Amino acid sequence: MALLEMKHITKKFGDVTALHNISIELEAGEILSLCGENGSGKSTLMKILCGIYPCGDYSGDIYFSESELKARNIRDTEEKGISIIHQELTLVKNMSVLENIFLGNEITHKGLTADNEMYLRCKNLLQQVQLDADPNTRVGELGLGQQQLVEIAKALNKQVRLLILDEPTASLTEKETEILLNLIKDLKAHNIACIYISHKLNEVKAISDKICVIRDGEHVGTKDASTMTEDDIITMMVGREITSLYPHEPHEIKDEILRVENLSAWHPINTHIKRVDNVSFSLHEGEILGVAGLVGSGRTDMVQCLFGSYEGKFEGNIFINQKQVNIKNCAQAIEHKIVMVPEDRKKHGIVSIMGVGKNITLSSLKSYCFGKMVVNEAKEEQIIGSAIKRLKVKTFSPDLPIGRLSGGNQQKAILAKCLSLNPKILILDEPTRGIDVGAKYEIYKLINQLAQEGIAIIVISSELPEVLGISDRVLVMHQGKLKASLINTALTQEQVMETALKE
């Protein structure tokens, strides 16, 4: 019998059916990838499995290790050996690695915590997940990839038999991702099953035994991973064939709009360290300029200098339309028609408790005001409605808190906010991070449309196929230096990486 069986699961929120008659099976030591667009029902299904939505809140049956599972809460499922690691990690940053791993599961003898035993156990767990860290290290001092490994060690400490990973590599470097995927394969060898949720289809293909696709709350199908291509997965996810993930519309590249000369930036704290080292480049109207490089190459630092949001010291010459400008803060950048979609949308891009509409107009309120204080609400509503329609933001209402939207729809709303400022230069830092394939495709189409309208666009992405798929020209950076500016005529990933790494 299978380790996990979920049979005919249906979940409703009021009159809205979030899941309809979904069934999945998983064997011990098997890796099942769960794919679907944001809002398809993946998270709802996992919340049912983990006891976040308790027995009675849904219809259908769940069997785990040949016994019926009627979980009332997460504690019930953890005791059975089911653990979930969310995209937003749940570790307590101010506590040590050891304290996080044993939180709520302390080893005690006669009412006293067995500190030495926990320390040795923690060392052993960290060894299992290949994390070279002292158990007494504060979690906040670790990188995201290392914190992810602490979460897995915590699950192993609870005798996990089924590990659920939700977008585990969204914020990880390529090296950290490789370590994590190898660890999952190692867990598989020890008969631990895994449900893997990711929008990165290359990872899904590399790691999975089976791939299950959910669309609009319905089970589209589960197939052997070896029989599926990435295009097959995309077609099942979106319900239509996408002939090219990177749509390319011809657009005219016109005059130079931006020129940067000798831009340098220093670390905000360790001021002797250069994060950007004497970088010079140009950008033209209607051009899509990709910026490629490994983590730490200085890409984000460079564009933050252009937008006036860099926290440390920076210097250099910036010219817009051949005229030298002084940009020391975001307000000055916006005055010069430069806008930016930031890398961390939740931290820097949205006010999560505010409505979608208010987020869209937040940066351009001055243009909807009578005088300095009174907002022209009719004009504001018109702008909001037009922006939501143009960018296809899926929301029940403009007043819905933006934090309740999917990542893709949040990103579209941030783009709408930027476009409400009528920019001439648009900077996009990781524009599709944590976004499903359908939303990515729509954002790529929008980037092309904006280039056709003459907007100059800078795109930073950790995904090389994305940079190569949408850019007219690619800047290659490494350790703060600009290594090359390459015209994108049949550029390959290998050529870009070779350029970045060669001395």
Curated annotation (Swiss-Prot):
It comes from the Bacteria. It comes from Haemophilus influenzae (strain ATCC 51907 / DSM 11121 / KW20 / Rd). The complex is composed of two ATP-binding proteins (XylG), two transmembrane proteins (XylH) and a solute-binding protein (XylF). One of its GO terms (molecular function) is ATP binding. PROSITE patterns: ABC_TRANSPORTER_1 (PS00211), ABC_TRANSPORTER_2 (PS50893), XYLG (PS51280). The gene is xylG. It catalyses: D-xylose(out) + ATP + H2O = D-xylose(in) + ADP + phosphate + H(+). Belongs to the ABC transporter superfamily. Xylose importer (TC 3.A.1.2.4) family. PANTHER family: CARBOHYDRATE TRANSPORT ATP-BINDING PROTEIN MG119-RELATED (PTHR43790), XYLOSE IMPORT ATP-BINDING PROTEIN XYLG (PTHR43790:SF1). Residues 4-241, 258-499 form the ABC transporter domain. ATP binds at G36, E37, N38, G39, S40, G41, K42, S43. Pfam families: ABC_tran (PF00005). GO terms for cellular component: plasma membrane. It is a peripheral membrane protein. It is found in: Cell inner membrane. InterPro entries: AAA+_ATPase (IPR003593), ABC_carbohydrate_import_ATPase (IPR050107), ABC_transporter-like_ATP-bd (IPR003439), ABC_transporter-like_CS (IPR017871), ABC_transptr_XylG (IPR013455), P-loop_NTPase (IPR027417). This is Xylose import ATP-binding protein XylG.
